[in-house]
Amino acid sequence: MTRTKKTTAPAKTKEIGLGFITELDRYLFGQGTHYKIFEKLGAHPKTYKGKAGMYFAVWAPHAKAVGVVGDFNGWDPDAAPMSPLADSGIYEAFIPGVGLGELYKFAITTQEGMILFKADPYAVHAEFRPGTASITEDINGFKWDDAAWMETRKKADPVKSPMAIYEVHLGSWRKKDRPQKEGYYTYMEAAHELADYVKKMGYTHVELMGIAEHPYDGSWGYQVTGYYAPTSRYGTPKEFMYFVNYLHKKGIGIILDWVPAHFPKDAHGLADFDGQPLYEYADPRKGEHPDWGTKVFDYSKNEVKNFLIANALYWVENFHVDGLRVDDVASMLYLDYGRSDGNWVPNKYGENKNLEAIEFFRHLNSVLTGHLTGAMMIAEESTAWPGVTKPPEEGGLGFTFKWNMGWMHDFLEYMKLDPYFRKFNHNKMTFGITYATSENYILTLSHDEVVHLKCSMINKMPGLNGDKFANLKAGYTFMMGHPGKKLLFMGQDFGQYHEWDEKVSLDWYLADEPLHKDLQKYYSDLLHVYQKYPALWQLDSDWNGFQWINANDGDRSIFSFIRRDETGKKNLLFVINFTPVARDDYRVGVPKSGTYSLILDSGHGLYKRGEHAFSARSKKRECDGQPYSFAYPLPAYGAAIFKFN
C-alpha cells in the first residue's frame, strides 16, 4: 500500500531520522497536502553535525534498498546507502562534502534484486541531453525585482483584462550560429530579444512550450522526466528566473505548458520508479496511454497528487510564472480516452468519467486560488465537458480559462475554403457566438495547427500569394473581434511558409519581404488596437459584450458586429468581407446616430496605417434591423474596425 492512511495530524513537528523531515511533513505528504514538499524531497545543501554537504530524500516505498550515486562516489550503488524514514516510504541520506553542480541519481534496488538508476523526481536541474543525471543545485537567493508586477497580478482579474498570447518554442524561435548546445539561445539571451519583439508587436503574454526537462526534442516538451527542472537546453534554473524577471519588468506575462496527464517510459524517469508502478496506475487499462505510448499518473494516490500540485505551486511561487496551460485535460477526464471497448475500466458508477482526475483538478485549482497567487490555470480541453471554468463549489473544475477548440476548428475550416464555397458554410463563423460565454475562453491558433501536413497559417489560405495574405489579415481581424482572449503561435504573425519544425529556426528573413512585413505590421496594429480598447476584452464572457449587426449576409460572406465595453460608450464596429469581390457602397446598420471613424482597415494591398482615413455620420435609414446606417467602400477581403463618436 503506497498511500498513507488517514490519521490525526501530529501535535508538534517532531524530527525523525536525520532531522530534516518532521512527522508533520510525513503526515501532510501522506494526505497529499504538503504543498512545499519539494523543499523536503530531492537534493538540498545542508549542514549536519557541523559538516557541509548535501541532503538527499526520495519516495520509493516498494524498494528493497536505495542509495545515492554520482561523480562524488564513482557511481557505486553501495557507496552511499539511504535510510528508510519509518514507514513513510521515504529514504534519506546526508553526504558530507557534496556541493553544487554534482551529477547524481538514485540507485534503487527492487524487490527482485535489480538495480534501477533513476533521476531525482524533485531535481531542480538536470544534465543536458543525451545525459540523464540530475544535478545538485540551490534555487534560493535569486534577486527578484518584479514586485510591482507580482502585486498587480494578485489584484487583477484576468477574465476582464487584455490577453494576447505569443506561443513560443524557445529552441526554434531563433538560433545562434555557434556549435554549443546546437545554437540554442540561453534563457538570458532569449529574454532580451523576445521581450523586445513581444513588446513591439503588442502581445501581453508569452506561452512557453517545453520548459520542464524532457529527453526527446520531438516530444516538444510534452513527455517530461524532470517536472521541477527548467530544461538545461537553455541554461540553469536561476537563468530561467532571470528570463521571467526580465519579461515581467517589460510588462510581459509568462505562461508555461504543464503536463500532468502522462509521462514517458524512459528508464531514468518516473515509470516503475521503484520496480513497481508508483507514479502511474498499476492496471494498464488505466496506467498506459495507448495513443502516446506513455504512462498515466495515478490520481488516486495522495503522494502522486501532492507531487503534481506542489509542482504547480513551485512554478508559480518560486519562478513567478503567471499561469499554467494544462495539456490534454480531456485525456485525464475520460477513462476511455484513446481506448477501445474492453480496454478501459469504468468508474464505480459504470461511467467513463475519471472521478479521481476530476477531484485532482478541483483540488489543484482550489489550492492555486487559495494561495492568492493571482496565477491563471488554463485548460486545453477538447470536448464539451461542462463547467471547466466554473468554481469547484459550483460543480466546475475551477480553471481560469479554457482553450476554445471548437471555434478554432470551425474558423480554420472556413478560412481554408475557396471564397465561392464560403457562403455555403457561413454558420461555421457564426456558431461560435452561441456558446462564447459558456466558459472563459481563449481563441487559439497554436503549434498543433501548423504541423503534421496541416500547413502553416498562410498556406492554409486559398488563392494566389497576394490573396493568401489578404485572407489571413481578414481572418485575424475576425479573431481579434470575436469574444475570447487570443493566442497565436510564433511565425504565424509574419506568414511563415514552412510548417513548424522544432529542429530549425523560424524563417526570419521573410519578415523583410513586402507581403510578410505588411502582414506582421497589420497584426501588430491589431494587437495594439486590442490592448487600447476595453471593448475587445472587458466583457469576453458576458453576453452584453457582443452584438451581431448582420450574421446572415452569407451570400456575400460579410460579417458585421459590435463589441462593447462595460460603459457601453466606447464600442467598436467590425465589418469583414471574406470574398474577393469589393463592395464599393456597402451599407452597415448601426444602433445609434453619430460619427463612425475608421481606426483600422486591412485593405487589399499593402497596409499603411492611416492611408484609408474614413469617417461617416450615420443616417436615419434602417439597415440590418438597425434604425441608422452608413455606407462604406469595403474592399475585396477587406476588414474594417470603426469607433463610435
Predicted features along the sequence, with ranges:
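Short glycine-biased active-site loop of nucleotidyltransferases that positions the nucleotide triphosphate
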Residues: 83, 216-221, 265-272, 389-390, ...
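Substrate-binding/active-site clefts of carbohydrate-active enzymes
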Residues: 127, 147-160, 169-353, 632
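Short, flexible loop/turn elements at secondary-structure junctions
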Residues: 60-62, 86, 97, 169-174, ...
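Conserved alpha/beta catalytic core and glycan-binding cleft of carbohydrate-active enzymes
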Residues: 320-322, 340-503, 510, 531-588, ...
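Carbohydrate-interacting/catalytic domains
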Residues: 1-162, 187-198, 202, 466-469, ...
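Short catalytic/ligand-binding loop motif for oxyanion handling, primarily in non-cytosolic enzymes
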Residues: 114-116, 174-176, 214-217, 262-265, ...
